[in-house]
């Protein structure tokens, strides 16, 4: 948790015209956290109850963080029981993307600020893990078996959050089950062979429902897409790739997403 003065100093750098990437690199604070501070400066108050299972359910305090976390969960997350009514949420983040690991942990803390978040090293990845009794209320898509073997549908309150923060939801899905690649070809122009590059985004998930949530949100955002095979969604038109670059990537440091993350 960063104090208010730290947040103000970071936002002062942004107001100078600095990019999120450069400020993140200088301060060591994730782009996700800095972006969240531009929308809400004050730290979220700590609370021991759950906004969803309270006697009168209320709105989440950081819906943008929730939209991002929901995308990560639907891509590479799971909710499992532990003991005495406690559950843990685990999201797999590749070692190659430490910024993604930071952003995932920040989002998890923002959604459940009163619970601890841990990083558990596994071969090739870090399992960002949060313990809480309330993950089943916050992520009602959890259930036995694999996500693509069961129905995945958003509750009305979740859909409202996704509709209000669509880019955060798309970022979470792409960061968990997507990639940005660059195709290239050569052409002879004026007797000279020239190389032309064509960046595109892919999102791959076995669940028809999760792919539909992704494409429905892209439709809302005006991003053109097409399905290239049974599990794969492609975004390749130049204007749509530019939109994705502006909101999803470049991601961390000076690197674009170039491998599955």
Predicted regions, residues:
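Internal intein/HINT superfamily modules and their associated LAGLIDADG
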Residues: 1-261
């Amino acid at each position: 948790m960063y104090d208010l003065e730290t947040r103000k100093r970071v936002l002062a750098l942004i107001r100078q015209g600095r990019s999120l990437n450069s400020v993140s690199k200088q301060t060591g604070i994730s782009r996700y956290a800095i972006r969240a501070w531009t929308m809400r400066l004050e730290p979220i108050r700590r609370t021991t109850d759950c906004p969803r299972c309270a006697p009168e359910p209320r709105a989440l305090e950081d819906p943008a963080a929730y939209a991002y976390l929901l995308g990560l969960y639907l891509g590479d997350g799971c909710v499992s029981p532990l003991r005495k009514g406690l559950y843990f949420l685990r999201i797999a983040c590749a070692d190659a993307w430490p910024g993604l690991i930071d952003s995932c942990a920040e989002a998890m803390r923002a959604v459940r600020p009163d619970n601890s978040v841990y990083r558990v090293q596994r071969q090739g990845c870090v399992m960002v893990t949060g313990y809480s009794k309330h993950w089943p209320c916050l992520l009602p898509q959890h259930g036995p078996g694999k996500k693509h073997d069961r129905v995945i549908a958003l509750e009305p309150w979740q859909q409202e959050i996704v509709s209000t923060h669509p880019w955060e939801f798309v970022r979470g899905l792409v960061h968990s089950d997507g990639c940005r690649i660059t195709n290239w070809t050569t052409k002879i122009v004026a007797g000279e062979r020239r190389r032309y590059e064509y960046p595109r985004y892919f999102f791959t998930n076995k669940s028809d429902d999760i792919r539909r949530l992704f494409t429905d949100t892209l439709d809302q955002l005006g991003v053109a897409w097409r399905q290239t095979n049974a599990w794969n969604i492609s975004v390749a038109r130049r204007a749509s790739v530019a939109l994705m670059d502006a909101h999803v990537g470049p991601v961390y440091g000076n690197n674009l997403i170039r491998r599955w993350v």
